[in-house]
């Protein structure tokens, strides 16, 4: 994904 607002997302890195 792009910029994920959820820091709990594994895609957040």
From Swiss-Prot:
Function: Stimulates synthesis of ecdysteroid in the testes of larvae and pupae.
Protein name: Testis ecdysiotropin peptide E
